[in-house]
Each structure stands twice: as structure tokens, then as C-alpha cells.
Amino acid sequence: ALSVVYPTEEDTAVYGPLAQMDYETWNKWVEFVGKKGGYGSDLAANGTVKNQEELDNIIGKYAYGYNVVAGRVNYRDEIKLANGGAAGGYVGSMQTGTITNGQAYQAKTIKGLRCAGGFAGEMINGGAAKLGGVDILGLNLQLGQMLQVLNVFVPVIKKSSVEGYQSGLIVQSEGVDNKNICGYAGGYVGKLIGGQIWGENDARCKVTKLRRVDGRSYVGGFVGSSRPGSVATLNPTAGEGLLSQLLNKLLSTPADLIKVLNATVATIRYADVEAWDDWGIIVNGAYASGSNNTSYAKAAGGFAGNLEGTVLGKKDTEKAGVSVQNIRSVVAGEYAGGCFGVADVAGVANISAGNETSLLDKLLKLGRTDVLDAFRSYVYYGTVSGSKDAGL
């Protein structure tokens, strides 16, 4: 029943205005609309064309990319409003589903209050605890069924990329609040919780022609913040707490719990960040505050601002690694790095927000130190290069 409502998209793309215009349609427009003056008269002055190449040369002078803006300017902690303020070049907020070979071209400026990303504003393994009239938390599921339920709520992006406009893609998340809910910005995705981003050797997940990323909490050239789906420090108002509730049912069976935890780890493979120009990419966490002082985001990195329980690349598979090219500068208040600002495990120690059950303590008392692997972050075959013009 869950799979019935599982959204999937394959082989789709987003373009800026005038892109993909074919020359036959162009000629008809010139003949019946453009030559009569008024709207588009400067375009129509080019006249009809004989082939697609001629048209592409004309449109290349006028194609101006597209902007995405999530318009809310103030955050409000209410169910109807908590999910607003997420902007992405392809998708704003992705709470489940799979996107395969989705492409975004000519993205110019992506701006959101809570989070912004060149491809996706946020990827969250969320969804309602009650779906289709079935109370998932009340079901008596075997482990295999439980894993299937978890997978339904894990968002996956495969072989999908975003290409910036010719003058470079700018990603901005300038919301400020006192709970670190706003201000997540990444060249590809702003906020990632338990999601999977998987490219392939011949179809990597890339953000190209990136110029700058600005955020006020966590900022990264590829991802602002990446965390596992088992974290307890989620925002239940925004529907982020389902997996923690499911995992809480398994606290008494550590062996099963470890398998489920591994299913919630965020993974990014075959992923790249490329600059718009040799001038390089700026990852910026500095901003002017109301008191005319300079304030800073907590963490920023050339690839990721914050990593928790995340695996970048793939063990023993060099080509599955991640790369950042042409980073010019990375600025943050507490943590800044060429690859990542901070990689931490603290956020996943408590799984039950109600009574603060310490999952880590419970498992360590049982001698299950192997569970620590589900909490650590790993980087396999990651590379960073500075700006060709000015270095890093």
C-alpha cells in the first residue's frame, strides 16, 4: 500500500526560457506573431532561420536562465508553515520518492528562507506517521517489512545534475532563527536527512557552473548539512521525526536496530562540484546582522558544511568518490574546511526525544561497539582543488 503513493520521476528536465526552442516553431512565431511588432520585436528582427544551428546562435544571445525563490521571509513553527521556505532548481522539498536522470539547466539564483540547493532545497526521510489510514507505528512488522517501510520514506536522487547559468549559479539561504532551522545552503542540496544521492561512473550527480553559496547556519559547495535519518534532533512539526519513532520500537533488539540504522545512513556517491569560471567558487557564511556587526554561519565547507552519519564516496571504489574543483574561499564562524566544515557524531546519540533514551549508552552496555559504524561519517576518495586564479 505504501508503494502506491511513492512518487517517482525519470528522464525529466527543467530549462530556462527559450531553451529547447526548435527552428520550425521559431519560424512560425516570427511569421505569425513576431513580425507584427510589439512583444519580442527585437527577437523577430532576426527573421526566419534555415536550421537549428542558426537558431541556437540567436537564442544564445538572449537565453537568461531562471530563478527560484521560496517567498516566505519569516519562519513560523506551525505545521502548515514549517515546511515552507525551501527552494531548489529542480525540487524544493523532497520528503520521499526517487528521481532518476533529472536535470536542471541554466539555473541562475536559488533562494529560500529555510534551505536552498541548486538541485533540491531539502531531502528528508519524512512523511506522516499515518498514511492511507494505516497507523505505521502501530503495525507489528517483521524486520524485513520494517526495512521496506523505511525505504519508502527515504528520498533517493540518481544520475541527476544541475548546471548553472553562463554567469554562474548563486544559491542563498538567508533565514535566521535561534534553533538552527533556517539558513541551510548547498550547491546541490541545502539540507539532507537520511537521503541518498547516487551517481554512476558515466552519469555523475554534479553541480556545474557554480559561482557562490551563501547561508547562515550550514553552507557547502555540494550540501549544506547531511545527517542520518535516525537523528533525534529533528523538527517533528515539519514531519521529520517518523524514523526516530520507528527506530524507538527496536531499542530492545540491538541486532535488528543496527540493520535499520544502516538503512538510514545518508550516502553521496559519484558527486562533483565544478565552478563557473577559473575565478572560482565562494562558500560564504558571513553576513551583516541587525547590529551592524558581522555574524557567521556555524560551519562551511567546499563540499559539505556539516556531516553526521554520512558516507561520501564508496569504500574500495575510487571512481565513486566526490570532488570539488576551483574553490576560492570558505568562510564560517566556528568550522571551515576545504572538503567539510565539521564531521560529528553527537547529534545521533539520543534517539528517544520523550525520555532521552541514549541509544549509544544502551548498545555499549550490551557490548555492541559495532553499532558505532552507523554513527560515523566516512569520506572515500574525496578531492578538493583551489581556484585556478587565486588558490584556496
Question: Predicted segments — roles?
Answer:
Residues 1-392:
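Surface-exposed loop/turn motifs in large extracellular/passenger domains
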